């Protein structure tokens, strides 16, 4: 089991030790569960009581944070980022064990790097490529002509369909499908004499996933009708997300669970969409846009804007509208009373109704 002194951890994350730098730590754990041999982290004031009561041997905190007397801490500008890096030290990513399981199916024309690991019942199709140190878990299917880069991890039952391209250091969580057919149909009122029908539009494009992307479990990224659906460098996509045909997701974007992005919409760099947000097709969403959970985006959004609600509006307007909801009943009563008063005054003055 790996262990590090507090000083060693500080050197790894660019932090400063307050307390015993020789303290040896053997793991990382939540504040409530950490023991004297483990390090934890504190970056959210909601957990102040847990921080003060914690039995952790040391805690990662940000500069200027008040700490209980005698507690060793590692001070660093971004405590959450430092936590992530320290956690990686104690729990390093799995490395490929260069082998192809006897029950894996590798087509003779496929090219699998000798350092890659292909587990039981994984399948690599004709002319497909799998890069160095990449791991294919059981049930993965890399289809005809698809390419998977170096240092990737494709978990159980991931599908990368024909001619799709996956970059380097990409993680695809279980059940993720890359390159499923886009939802494209043309209505045919005659149906070649057989009556009305929806005629399937061939989805002949592909999906390109750039480097350092992670795609969550059971997420679907549809292939383009023509051209490419693209997920930009460093984007992170949560579980159960739907990316439609020809969508362009900008670099470093974050799409939270159950987001849906309709066809041909373009998301700029660093867009963040909260859970269950829906974005209609053929829109332009600018760089750095923030979209609130359960929002329905139905128009282009300028770079840097934050929108909420359905239909989505600037977040400040949405907050005002939500604040008004609690008063609607009273306002309705007041309006009814005002109307009655106006009617009475008109009657007293002998005026007719307008």
From Swiss-Prot:
Pfam families documented for this protein: Hexapep, LpxD
GO biological process: one example: lipid A biosynthetic process
InterPro entries xref list: Hexapep (IPR001451), LpxD (IPR007691), Trimer_LpxA-like_sf (IPR011004), UDP_GlcNAc_AcTrfase_non-rep (IPR020573)
Source species, domain of life: Bacteria
Alphabetized UniProt keyword annotations: Acyltransferase, Lipid A biosynthesis, Lipid biosynthesis, Lipid metabolism, Repeat, Transferase
Keyword set includes Transit peptide: no
Enzyme class: transferase
Active site: 245
PROSITE patterns associated with the record: HEXAPEP_TRANSFERASES
Gene3D superfamilies: Hexapeptide repeat proteins, MurE/MurF, N-terminal domain
Pathway in which this enzyme or protein is active: Bacterial outer membrane biogenesis; LPS lipid A biosynthesis
Family: Belongs to the transferase hexapeptide repeat family. LpxD subfamily.
Subunit composition and interactions: Homotrimer.
Protein name, UniProt field: UDP-3-O-acylglucosamine N-acyltransferase
The organism of origin for this protein: Anaeromyxobacter dehalogenans (strain 2CP-C)
């Amino acid at each position: 089991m790996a262990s590090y002194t507090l000083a060693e951890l500080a050197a790894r994350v660019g932090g400063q030790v307050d307390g015993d730098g020789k303290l040896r730590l053997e793991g990382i754990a939540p504040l409530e569960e950490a023991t004297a041999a483990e390090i934890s982290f504190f970056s959210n004031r909601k957990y102040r009581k847990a921080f003060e009561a914690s039995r952790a041997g040391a805690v990662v905190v940000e500069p200027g944070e008040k700490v209980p007397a005698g507690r060793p801490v590692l001070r660093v500008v971004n405590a959450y980022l430092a936590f992530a890096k320290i956690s990686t030290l104690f729990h390093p990513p799995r490395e490929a064990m260069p082998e192809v399981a006897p029950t894996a199916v590798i087509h003779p024309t496929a090219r699998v790097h000798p350092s890659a690991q292909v587990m039981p019942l994984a399948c690599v199709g004709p002319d497909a490529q799998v890069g160095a140190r990449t791991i294919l878990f059981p049930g993965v299917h890399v289809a005809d002509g698809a390419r998977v880069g170096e240092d990737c991890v494709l978990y159980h039952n991931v599908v990368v369909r024909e001619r799709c391209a996956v970059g380097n250091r990409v993680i695809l969580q279980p059940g993720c499908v890359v390159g499923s057919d886009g939802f494209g149909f043309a209505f045919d009122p005659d149906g070649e004499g057989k009556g009305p029908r929806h005629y399937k539009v061939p989805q002949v494009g592909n999906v390109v996933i750039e480097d350092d992307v992670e795609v969550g479990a059971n997420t679907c990224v549809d292939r383009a009708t023509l051209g490419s659906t693209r997920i930009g460098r460093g984007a992170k996509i949560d579980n159960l997300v739907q990316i439609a045909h020809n969508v362009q997701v900008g670099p470093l974007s974050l799409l939270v669970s159950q987001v849906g992005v309709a066809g041909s919409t373009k998301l700029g760099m660093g867009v963040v969409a909260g859970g269950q947000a829906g974005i209609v097709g053929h829109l332009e969403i600018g760089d750095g846009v923030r979209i609130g959970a359960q929002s329905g985006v139905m128009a282009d959004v300028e770079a840097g804007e934050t929108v909420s609600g359905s239909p989505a509006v600037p977040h400040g307007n949405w907050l005002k509208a939500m604040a008004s909801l609690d008063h609607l009943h009273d306002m309705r009563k007041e309006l009814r009373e005002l109307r009655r008063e106006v009617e009475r005054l008109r009657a007293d003055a002998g005026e007719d109704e307008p």
